[in-house]
């Protein structure tokens, strides 16, 4: 039985993780959980249902209320609380389903304590890929990706020798603005952007999908996750979102993972690997006609892919800067302070002006993060 610490239990990934735990109670047990979002009612419902040994909350008012409602449960507060949850003796696997880099210290400490990591958080590897990879290697920790694309690549690479691999290929739906012309892109609204044709995601991720920044982040993530320095990592547009990742080998063969666009599939495999359990969702129905289309990324429309590749070339502080600057610009767009086109225009300007420097510690990463946020707010 795997004993889980779930960070971000009320978010989309967290809720589906608990759905799998609910389906397989003999395989998984929730030891601790944290929610730093606003859905306090749902979090309390989760605490009642799964009765973890401990939980963490984000402020003192919520902490006091939680302690009163659950007097026999241990509660922790703030960022330090995340670390306490993750390093509990009985925890075997940390499910990092929260967004942002707030959970980075907790994740690093959990790996030092020998905890397995199921990772849904793009920012952790984008900002601290070198540090996380080094910590995982030193402590013999295998990082199991939850993102559908990286989970697909992980499955394609299982049992393969590095020498035979030529390319890692991430697929992108193209987002809600795929078929709009360059002229139309200049006047898209927030509602246009948030109406994703395939995936039901949070606002920030949906905006990232529209700019393809999410795919840029995933290219960086794949580099650190798989450690294949001499292997090309690229993205292609695949509007149907049925194939999630592909590996091309030196002999020209391509292996892919295919399933309906539902995050439950990769979440479940990240939790059960290398075993496979029955899914509550229907798989592919090949009795019906299926269409698979692939298009190259138009870099004039989506400079985010080029920016991500430059991050990998420069490394150092560039990943943290790229991630933080984008977060602020997306927030400004959602607040209707800037246009959709401004996101990529301003992000490109910021990245061109950033002078890359070495970034080896958690303190370095947080310093870059703060610098980028301040500049992105002003530009």
From Swiss-Prot:
Top-level taxon in the UniProt lineage: Bacteria
What protein family is recorded?
A: Belongs to the DXR family.
EC number(s) given by UniProt: 1.1.1.267
Give, as in the UniProt entry, the pathway in which the protein acts. Isoprenoid biosynthesis; isopentenyl diphosphate biosynthesis via DXP pathway; isopentenyl diphosphate from 1-deoxy-D-xylulose 5-phosphate: step 1/6
User: What does the UniProt record say this protein does?
Assistant: Catalyzes the NADPH-dependent rearrangement and reduction of 1-deoxy-D-xylulose-5-phosphate (DXP) to 2-C-methyl-D-erythritol 4-phosphate (MEP).
- The protein's name is 1-deoxy-D-xylulose 5-phosphate reductoisomerase
> What GO molecular function annotation could you give as one example from this UniProt entry?
manganese ion binding
NCBIfam families in the cross-refs:
Dxr
Q: Which organism is it from?
A: Chlamydia pneumoniae
Q: Is Oxidoreductase set as a keyword in this record? A: yes
Q: Which InterPro entries match?
A: DXP_reductoisomerase, DXP_reductoisomerase_C, DXP_reductoisomerase_N, DXPR_C, DXPR_C_sf, NAD(P)-bd_dom_sf
